[in-house]
Amino acid sequence: TIMTDATGHPPITIDHLAVMGNIESGFKAVRVTSFEAHGPELNVNGNALIGAADGRDGLKLEIIAKQSNALSLLAFWPSFLVPEVRSYLGQSIIGGSATEASYRLDLDPSGLRAVIAKDVIPDNAVALDLNFTNGTLQPDKGLPTLKKMEGKVHVTGQKVSIDILGGTIDSGNGRVLTITDGTYRVFDTSLIPTVADINFHFAGAANDFATVLRSDMMRDISTPPLDPEKTSGNVTMAVKIGFPQKPDLKPSDIQVSAEGDLTDLTVENAFGAESLENGVVHVSASPQGLLIKGEGKLAGAPAKFDMHQQNGATTRDANVVMTIDETVREKKGIKTAGLVNGPVTLSFSLKGIGGKRVKGKGELDLTKASINGLIPGWTRPAGKSEKANFSIVISPDESISLDDLIIDDPSIYLKGKAEIGSDGVLRSVNLANLRINATDKVSASLEKAGIGYKISIQGDTLDGRALIKSALSS
């Protein structure tokens, strides 16, 4: 039985067809001593024995092929042999060449009865081996095309094995990832539909990887949120995919696991308006969700981070720790020279990234920094433990609200909130309570006014000596 028209493949051209054989005495068997089928893309020879002869009974078939089109050879794959796999490959293979192939079938009467009943045939009754080159495969209409595939196929009565020796993943627009090795397995052909188990390793550019993730099928599966136009770097990845071989696959039918690394990674607007540079990131994806851990420069500051997305969720959670020193502050236009000396550590945990509103908690660790007049009268030496805690809300326009901002230390006490614009510029600070000296009972506010800020202080008691000293020294 040749491949049906349902596959959409063109007919096979055969220029030479010859069959030689004889009928055994008593009409007990038909022996095909030679079978030849040759054409522009086909070079097949074979023999067969049907019936009782040579001390056996049943069907025995042998086919040898060389330098033939893969689709043409697929037409000689008997329809009763793992039909689901045959149908899947017939619809998925676009092109390729078989350098050599052999097919041997040996069915006794019980095996023939299994074929007639459409039951599973004995595993050792079939041996199909094929070496292929320059193969093109479309695993599913929603997945990227595999091209330039090199490998070998081995099929038995109950198992299918394909070893991939190399190839590429074509993500479109000239973007490709290199497949270094891989396997395709069907461990039990008795299942309906049969289940494919695929493992492969690939390497390439991070922006090409991001393009693959945006294919129709993959973007519905938990994957790293990368924009190809804003991503650069390198990627190496090991991927495992399992799915039933049936028409009209859905994302929920596909089980994907992946483990790999992105290096020298740059992602524009990785966290809001801030970019990640020189990133080294480990990615782990499973049916349970996605975990990303890495380090690099975020907003120009050395940072470590992790991000998690549960399977089926549309938002992600993240933890970030950044070290902000004088150089980073200067680049970001934060004028603290002489007021803050030494690095400060900013850490925050965010929930709901990718949603309409992101919320979280933050902490600013001042332990390694000395302060001299950042707020008039506030001084502290480096090495003394001091932390500021706050809650975070990031709005859709990427403006940031810092609420419940608290610093409680013998050198200062403040409680209030702050607003940072989508451009990263501090817009306002409102302190419901501010104490620099023991007798202070005031509130304070800071508002952006042109190129500077307007400061207001109200309250019952304020030791103004620090303010006057600060004003005279400025």
Regions found by a protein language model. Give the residues of each.
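A short, well-structured beta->alpha microelement
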Residues: 407-411
